[in-house]
UniProtKB/Swiss-Prot annotation:
Enzyme Commission number(s) of this protein: 2.5.1.75
Region (Interaction with substrate tRNA): 38-41, 162-166
UniProt protein name: tRNA dimethylallyltransferase
Record organism: Paramagnetospirillum magneticum (strain ATCC 700264 / AMB-1) (Magnetospirillum magneticum)
Gene name of the encoded protein: miaA
Matching Gene3D superfamilies: 1.10.20.140, P-loop containing nucleotide triphosphate hydrolases
Keywords: ATP-binding, Magnesium, Nucleotide-binding, Transferase, tRNA processing
Site feature (Interaction with substrate tRNA) residues: 104, 126
Catalytic activity as recorded in UniProt: adenosine(37) in tRNA + dimethylallyl diphosphate = N(6)-dimethylallyladenosine(37) in tRNA + diphosphate
Keyword Transport applies: no
GO molecular function annotations of the record: ATP binding; tRNA dimethylallyltransferase activity
GO biological process: tRNA modification
Length: 315
């Protein structure tokens, strides 16, 4: 049985900030289970581009919820929250510490704070939203949304396909604006004594890490990975299609650009995404500890000390 006396650790932060490696260190120090909180790494596609931990790293500590769904299956925050709750309960039952790590902020908020009680949207309506968006284009779809849900249309940028579709699905299925649902009290949070660590590297260092990691992915075979993925001809609106670097490397493979240009564009896209993630975590997540400096042995020792104090402190 879970309660607020049961401890759990969250490691959040932007891409390339060092979350996965730190999670393994914490798991080995405290007898933990690493639970994936990254929406791309849930799928069993594009392991290099999604920065899924390598098999050697995963062998160092138990890892859960990595590559557990095909890329054609959607993993909403509610679905992930339910899967994570089961893994956390199993960890506690085994006397182990759940360590949730990833950059999908909505996943982490879902498990820590709960979700607005939006009813399950029928797949037929979800499919209709995707079809309409593909046929109409973002701008026209945004205008159509404004007629049915002006509140969300005002909040959303026309370039955000996924959120536009979500807003349309909700108002179509429920007759209420997504904004109204989001104002409802949240439900379904996992009761735990949370220790949340946010990695927030200084931007020059984070951007350098983004670039060096992507170039390492290319060296390790990301082009072949994308070639094989493109051969599957999956629907273009699947979330996995937004894996950082996929579009740019696919353009190179199609002869639309040279490799250096593709890599530069992918690195820029990764930096942009990391910047957005960092901003989101700074404003949306209440952190027990924020670490901005380089992940040195000294800093890791400090993190271990803070976690140990948290584990020993009764609620």
């Amino acid at each position: 049985m879970t309660s607020t006396s049961t401890p759990a650790v969250v490691i959040a932060g932007p891409t390339a900030s060092g979350k996965s490696g730190l999670a393994v260190r914490i798991a080995r120090e405290f007898g933990g289970v690493v639970i994936n909180a990254d929406s791309m790494q849930v799928t069993d596609a594009l392991p290099l581009l999604t920065a899924r931990p390598a098999p050697g790293d995963m062998a160092l500590a138990p890892h859960r919820l990595y590559a557990v769904l095909p890329p054609t299956e959607l993993c909403s925050a509610a679905r992930w929250r339910d899967m994570a709750a089961m893994e956390m309960a199993a960890a506690w039952q085994a006397g182990m510490l759940p360590i949730l790590t990833g950059g999908t902020g909505l996943y982490l908020k879902a498990v820590m704070e709960g979700l607005s009680p939006i009813p399950e949207i029928p797949e037929s309506i979800r499919a209709e939203a995707r079809t309409l968006l593909a046929e109409m284009g973002n701008a026209a779809f945004h205008n159509r949304l404004a007629k049915h849900d002006p509140l969300m249309a005002e909040r959303l940028d026309s370039g955000n396909s996924q959120r536009l579709a979500r807003a349309w699905e909700v108002v179509t299925a429920t007759g209420r604006s997504l904004a109204e649902w989001q104002d409802e009290p949240r439900e379904g949070a996992v009761e735990a004594r949370w220790f949340s660590l946010v990695l927030d590297p200084e931007r020059p260092r984070l951007y350098a890490q983004c670039e060096s990691r992507f170039r390492a992915m290319v060296t390790a075979g990301a082009l072949d990975e994308v070639r094989d993925f493109e051969a599957l001809r999956l629907p273009p609106d699947l979330p996995i299609q937004k894996a950082l670097g996929r579009r740019e490397l696919a353009a190179h493979l199609a002869g639309e650009t040279d490799l250096d240009t593709a890599i530069a564009a992918a690195c820029q896209a990764t930096r942009n995404y990391a910047k957005r993630q960092g901003t989101w975590f700074r404003h949306q997540m209440m952190a027990s500890l924020t670490a901005s400096e380089q992940l040195s042995e000294s800093l890791i020792a400090t993190i271990f000390l803070k976690i140990r104090q948290h584990l020993l402190t009764a609620p």
